[in-house]
Amino acid sequence: MSKKSIGSRTLKAGAALLAVGAGVAAINAKNKNGTEKKEIKEIQKKEYEQYRNTERGKYDKNSKGIYYSNGNYEAFARPEKPEGVDAKSAYIVGSGLASLAAACFLVRDGQMKGSHIHILEAMDIAGGACDGINDPTRGYVMRGGREMENHFECLWDLFRSIPSLEKPGASVLDEYYWLNKHDPNYSLCRATVNQGEDAHTDGKFNLSQKGCMEIMKLFFTKDEDLYDKKIEDFFDEEVFDSDFWLYWRTMFAFENWHSALEMKLYIQRFIHHIGGLPDFSALKFTKYNQYESLILPMQKYLEAAGVKFQFNTRVENVIFEFKDGKKIARTIECNVKGKEETIELTENDLVFVTNGSCTESTIYGDHTHAPVGDAEVRTSGCWSLWKNIAKQDPLFGHPEKFCGNVSKSNWESATVTTSDEKIIDHIKKICKRDPRTGNVVTGGIVSCKDSSWLLSWTINRQGQFKEQKKDEVCVWVYSLFTDVAGDYVKKPMKECTGEEITAEWLYHIGIPVDEIDELAKNHCLSLIHI
């Protein structure tokens, strides 16, 4: 008998055995499945007998003391005064929007005595990133702005209780609502090319089917699968070359190498306004800058309630005790006007910390000086505070993920103030509105699509500052690529003076090249923030 014939017979026998085995397995599986189905039906029958249609327990607190609700039934009800709140105190590090909101909710809903609330601020003015002041020697300071929309539920809930400083008897929400009803926001020119020509993006995303699928894939990816992933790990030119990406990255200051998880969270947060993204019709803005329209009313409300603002107080560390699986804040270490001090905490003390900020470590320049030195994470400030806290336990997070690579996370802005009619005529030509009416002007940023810096600029309702002269127009300019040579000014933005940044902006709004230098030097005043 040949080896070949032995092999064939063996294979046939093996196949037969497999077939028999499969048959036995199928019978067993059938019996098993039948038993399982019977058991499942018995369980379902018992559950059905015990089931009652009810909402009892629906709003019970979970293990974190939180429960979820919807509708507006609970939104307008005043909470009962918490037991023991009169014995409690709160220490809030920083005086930005988040910190002031925490203090306001403690006063209004927590019914904590204002004198028991302490706001510790390193600067000599409240507001944090929500700044907006007039420096007589350098010009207007405004490092950014707030883009708001209908579904800022917590913000609107708060500001319905904050009295307006402009309209007696009204709240900040009232005046804001009336303003945006009478003067709704939208852009008439979202992007330009060729020195001030309308790019005619015309409200379209110009996304291919493949690009749409790349965005959807990111949208449905689990958060934990996005850790340490970049946007460019998910998107290619199908997205990056689209107008959708132009709108998105300039509106939210995203770079291709930024966090894919952050990108996903932003999409989820604003997906309901995707139709209003191209022309900013989804957005609403305040009358003045964010400091005068939002921060000051909150500060006045808190001061009237007796809340203590302690300026020139830099918090350097919060020392924790680890006991029975809990992390308990025991000591606040701070520097008050150059003197080291500590605040000892008890079980009745609450501590709130803002751990990080996109405007922390800002360096400034002016019209004739570039920002001095490289932007870096300083040895003080909220990044360093977070680092000191994180050293005590890995569960306090990883601040270096957010501030460890300055070259990949910096961006630069400038405020340019002018009253020159020639410049203002070019502004009118692009935004199709008169910037001196007090109404919406650009309606959001205008992005220079072919700019090497990816320069964008915006003009909000004027005057943007209460002290601003009627003939002045204040422009906010910002760029994402600070280390690339400009198109008119052949040097990186981060090396430019305010005059040079102004010149680059004038070039992109269509000012004749032979007039740019003189107008930038003598007809504008600028202040830089990086």
Go through each PLM region and give its residues.
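Glycine-rich Rossmann-fold phosphate-binding loop(s) that bind the pyrophosphate
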Residues: 94-96
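Rossmann-like flavin
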Residues: 164-272, 284
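Glycine-rich FAD pyrophosphate-binding loop
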Residues: 107-133
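Helical element adjacent to the flavin cofactor pocket in flavoenzyme catalytic cores
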Residues: 271-349, 355
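N-terminal Rossmann-fold NAD(P) dinucleotide-binding loop
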Residues: 99
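Conserved FAD-binding subdomain of flavin-dependent enzymes
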Residues: 137-178
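C-terminal segments that line or cap access tunnels to active or ligand-binding sites in enzymes
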Residues: 273-286, 348-350, 355-528
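Extreme N-terminal leader/targeting segments of oxidoreductases
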Residues: 6-9, 14-90, 108-114, 528
